[in-house]
């Protein structure tokens, strides 16, 4: 399965921590909720539920030339793909390859998921 998705928020901006009274909670940020909705829309109504061991190739096209750690977008992206129903859990992934490509306006990621 191949998908072209918007550039995801980094792991540093994916979750937010809130304290209500004495209780602390970790919630998805607004950026993360919007990104998940975009991934679900790109996958479609009936996603293929892959059940075996998986390989994932991610091509990252950053929105600008700022220095970024490309591993900071892996976890949010993989979680969103699982939430969209591509696979049951990202623990199914045995092979993961991430490459940084040239900058494009707005940024994007191209994801290929294959069964091994």
Residue ranges and their predicted role:
Residues 1-116:
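Acidic, proline/glycine-enriched N-terminal capping motif
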